[in-house]
Amino acid sequence: MRRTFVYRVLGVWELARAFSVVLLTIVSHYQAPVSWTGPHPDYFSMTVLWDGSWYRLIAEQGYPPALPIDAVTGTVQQNAWAFYPAFPEMSRLLMWVTGLGFPVVGSPLALLLGFAAAVAMGLLLRDRV
């Protein structure tokens, strides 16, 4: 019974991930050049947009030594400290072990962790769903 449930969760998760891969691949052809991707981004370039760019920065360079403060307003600017360290540290370790870059290491790691989270949530909530 439990194994069948995990397979069902895996099936739904795989469909959702396949949809997002197809969607990112399609929209990459329409993505305007930005500093994170440059012109003509591929799938892996698209995975480091949005929050992925912050995780990449942390994995490659670490956290900044101090919070960046806007000189005019005195407010804290956007920075890497808004993101938890577990994912970028795991990515950094895999980058070191494999010699591969963050987009190639981070994307499969996020998929694996997402699957583990989907199974855990499914097992925790299956009596309520």
Predicted regions mapped to residue ranges:
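Start-transfer (signal-anchor) and selected internal transmembrane alpha helices
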Residues: M1-T37
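Membrane-interfacial loop-to-transmembrane-helix junctions in polytopic alpha-helical membrane proteins
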Residues: F5, F102-V105
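Alpha-helical transmembrane segments of multi-pass integral membrane proteins
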Residues: V12, N79-A80, G106-L111
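Alpha-helical elements of Rossmann-like donor-binding domains used by nucleotide-donor carbohydrate transfer enzymes
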Residues: R17, W54-L57, E89, A120-L124
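Transmembrane alpha-helical core positions of polytopic small-molecule transporters
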Residues: R17, Y84, G114-F115
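Juxtamembrane/transmembrane-helix boundary motifs at the membrane-water interface
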Residues: L24-Y43, A66-V76, V97, F102
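Short hydrophobic/aromatic helix or loop-helix immediately within or flanking a transmembrane segment
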Residues: M46-G99
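Transmembrane-helix motifs of polytopic, lipid-linked glycan transferases
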Residues: R92-W96, V105-R128
